[in-house]
């Protein structure tokens, strides 16, 4: 949620920033509501002053033994008017708040302006894509041929965009997740968390999935609970309505969870394989940072994700998302895209974002300055560290051999019981 004072004092600044996102949001809606709310509050204060004056006159008349019925009747009318205006002001405030919950975050000044993914800016590339002596296959062919990925039975169990992992594939998925977690905990200082996989509406609102993107979520209708689309949701909301201590910042949490997405609007995209699933495993990184150091934390988090890819020997590139391609809650985002030789292109495997105080305002997450003073909103960050299924895809495609086998990256072999090569 944006700062109410910023919207009130500099609506034109907000309008310009949102225009960078190519948003059709009309700031005049907020201005109209805010003007009405302020007018109502002013009228209420004036009537309260009148009520106090009338109360004093009633008391004076009674002390003098005079008839105060007319004054009492006028006092009752004023009180009823105040009550009605209070209700109207509350309704306007609620409408204003609902409007603010649909407004995306403002892009940071370092974010390139653009409309969509075609305007994203490449920052760097790491690793050289392997030169194959044969035509590399796509992961779904490799996985099925080796007896590890079963899309047919998954379709029988659940439908499209689901996968059954067998034998080595199930173990490789688990190995990747454990390797990611162990690295984040031991090398990067994160605290591991195992959160609920379904959350309430308030929690989804805190991180920005609701109210605008409900169609992207899986909802348990009878309970009004939602399956999490990412562990960012429960991890960030762990400190909702709390005041942290400045000395405890930054805080870093990591979790391995299933993620559930309806993929609304993705009809016809990535219909084969593991790239776009209704259920997938991801290891998430979430950080709570001091406002003055959140962009340092963004670079650090990006480095944590990059190191995983480097240790796996997977070529990748880093891009800065343009203003029109960023997620709703982000003020700046880096995407890491891994090279997939079977598809002959880079595909997203991690997204690392600084959300500034946007989520903290929605979830009411603050910190107490070390020197005392009024609590301030923290800055929240989140990043994939990494998407497990997509990393499995990258391993299969980059380490495939001409005979159909797949070499297991060295860092994963301890998690695979020493297995060096996957064969049928």
From Swiss-Prot:
Q: Name one GO molecular function term.
A: ATP binding
Q: Where in the cell is it found?
A: Cytoplasm
Q: Which residues form the signal peptide?
A: none
> Which top EC class is given?
ligase
Q: Does the keyword Nucleotide-binding apply?
A: yes
Q: Does the record's keyword annotation contain Ligase?
A: yes
Any single biological process term in GO: seryl-tRNA aminoacylation
> Which reaction is recorded as catalysed by this protein?
tRNA(Ser) + L-serine + ATP = L-seryl-tRNA(Ser) + AMP + diphosphate + H(+); tRNA(Sec) + L-serine + ATP = L-seryl-tRNA(Sec) + AMP + diphosphate + H(+)
> What's the domain of life for this entry?
Bacteria
Question: Quick one: which residues bind L-serine?
Answer: 230-232, 284, 384
Positions annotated to bind ATP: 261-263, 348-351
Cellular component (GO) terms are: cytoplasm
Tell me which UniProt keywords the record has, alphabetically. Answer: Aminoacyl-tRNA synthetase, ATP-binding, Cytoplasm, Ligase, Nucleotide-binding, Protein biosynthesis
Named in its record, the pathway it takes part in is:
Aminoacyl-tRNA biosynthesis; selenocysteinyl-tRNA(Sec) biosynthesis; L-seryl-tRNA(Sec) from L-serine and tRNA(Sec): step 1/1
* Pfam families according to UniProt: Seryl_tRNA_N, tRNA-synt_2b
Its EC number is 6.1.1.11
> What does the record give as the function of this protein?
Catalyzes the attachment of serine to tRNA(Ser). Is also able to aminoacylate tRNA(Sec) with serine, to form the misacylated tRNA L-seryl-tRNA(Sec), which will be further converted into selenocysteinyl-tRNA(Sec).
Q: Kindly state the subunit structure of this protein.
A: Homodimer. The tRNA molecule binds across the dimer.
Domain remark from Swiss-Prot or TrEMBL: Consists of two distinct domains, a catalytic core and a N-terminal extension that is involved in tRNA binding.
Q: Which family does it belong to?
A: Belongs to the class-II aminoacyl-tRNA synthetase family. Type-1 seryl-tRNA synthetase subfamily.
NCBIfam families per the record? serS
Q: Which HAMAP family match?
A: Ser_tRNA_synth_type1
Protein's UniProt name: Serine--tRNA ligase
Q: Which organism is it from?
A: Nitratidesulfovibrio vulgaris (strain DP4) (Desulfovibrio vulgaris)
């Amino acid at each position: 949620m944006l700062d109410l004072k910023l919207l009130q004092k500099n609506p034109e600044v907000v309008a310009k920033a949102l225009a960078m996102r190519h948003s059709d949001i009309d700031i005049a809606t907020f201005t109209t509501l805010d003007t009405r709310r302020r007018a109502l509050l002013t009228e209420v204060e004036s009537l309260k002053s009148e009520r106090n004056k009338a109360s004093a006159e009633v008391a004076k008349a009674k002390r003098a033994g005079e008839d105060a019925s007319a004054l009492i009747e006028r006092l009752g009318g004023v009180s009823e008017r105040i009550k009605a205006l209070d209700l109207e002001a509350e309704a306007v405030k609620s409408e204003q708040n609902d409007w603010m919950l649909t407004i995306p975050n403002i892009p940071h000044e370092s974010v390139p302006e653009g409309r969509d993914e075609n305007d994203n800016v490449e920052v760097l590339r790491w690793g050289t894509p392997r030169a194959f002596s044969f035509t590399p296959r796509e992961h779904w062919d490799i996985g099925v041929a080796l007896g590890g990925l079963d899309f047919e039975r998954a379709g029988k169990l659940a439908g499209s965009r689901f996968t059954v992992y067998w034998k080595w594939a199930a173990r490789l998925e688990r190995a990747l997740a454990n390797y990611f977690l162990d690295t984040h905990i031991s090398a990067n200082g994160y605290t591991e968390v195992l959160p609920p996989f379904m959350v309430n509406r308030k929690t989804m609102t805190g991180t920005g999935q609701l109210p605008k993107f409900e169609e992207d979520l899986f909802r348990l209708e009878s309970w009004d609970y939602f399956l999490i689309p990412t562990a960012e949701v429960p991890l960030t909301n762990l400190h909702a309505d709390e005041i942290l201590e400045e000395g405890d910042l930054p805080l870093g949490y990591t979790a391995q969870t299933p993620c559930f997405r309806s993929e609304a609007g993705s009809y016809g995209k990535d219909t084969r394989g593991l790239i776009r699933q209704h259920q997938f495993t991801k290891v998430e990184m979430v950080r709570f940072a001091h406002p003055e150091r959140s962009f340092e934390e963004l670079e650090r988090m990006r480095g944590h994700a990059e190191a995983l890819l480097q240790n796996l020997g997977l070529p990748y590139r880093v891009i800065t998302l343009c203003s029109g391609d960023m997620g709703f809650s982000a003020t700046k985002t880096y995407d890491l895209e891994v090279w997939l030789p079977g598809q002959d292109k880079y595909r997203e495997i991690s997204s690392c974002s600084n959300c500034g105080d946007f989520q903290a305002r929605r979830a009411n997450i603050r910190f107490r300055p070390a020197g005392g003073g009024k609590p301030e909103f923290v800055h929240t960050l989140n990043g994939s560290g990494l998407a497990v299924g997509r990393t499995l895809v990258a391993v299969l495609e980059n380490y495939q051999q001409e005979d159909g086998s797949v070499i297991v990256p060295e860092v994963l072999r301890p998690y695979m019981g020493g297995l060096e090569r996957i064969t049928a």
